[in-house]
Amino acid sequence: GGSTLGTQTIYEFFKDIVKKDFVFIDNLTQKKLNTKKNRSVNLVVSKSGNTIETVVNSNIYIRRKDANIFITENNDNYLLKLANKLKAEIVHHNNYIGGRYSVLSEVGMLPAELMGLDANKFRQLNSLIKNKHFINSLVSGVSSTLNYIKNKKYNSIILNYDEKSENLFKWYQQLVAESLGKKSKGLLPIVSNMPKDNHSVMQLYLDGFKNNFYTFFYTNELKSETLKSSQILSSQKFLRGKNLSNIMYAQKIGTENILNKKKIPFRSFE
């Protein structure tokens, strides 16, 4: 949840300049991890200190001789007791910062510092508030979403054409679901990784029930792989000279055109 998704997003965006390798264990898994134990640190994060998945993974992966850091609340919880037993480093999580916002607390900022990033640069709220374009975009986005809800469109579907943003939208999914899913109300956030999902759920999006609204997301990847033109057969010669980013953009435009023809509401960010 909030104890890892924000941090994963930070790492994904900055990993080209981060000199350390980070492995995120955010679920119960049977897979074995290949880490250099003598050169690794276990960072165990849980606000409550009693999250079952974190407790189980801690039992499987960490040992007393490891370098261990625990981030949890300062109360009578399981992970705090374990940290004391292991004589591990302990960072107390401030209990007035909720899980949805914890990326700006020690939960997100300590990992950011370990990545070699400056935590202070993540806290630029004042500059955002003073940015009229940001505020206007925020108001416009909220207004359009409320309009969709009034028209009984409760499924917010992200059509994501940017591989680097996958963790960002997993985080978005968690934030929207936990923030708005209350009192029998809310939005159902669904993330589709495109263009792969053209061959799975797109049929439902186009011709299924009509309580969805869509958001396209695309970024132009400057270092995109270029196809080997000499190996493209003549039947698909339109692909010659194209790179992956060109192709994905063309597919995005094509999908938007289809939604327009079917009068299906969407917004698009590039």
Place the predicted regions along the sequence by residue.
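Acidic catalytic cores of enzymes that act on phosphate-bearing nucleotides/polynucleotides
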Residues: 9-11, 18-20, 117-120, 131-258
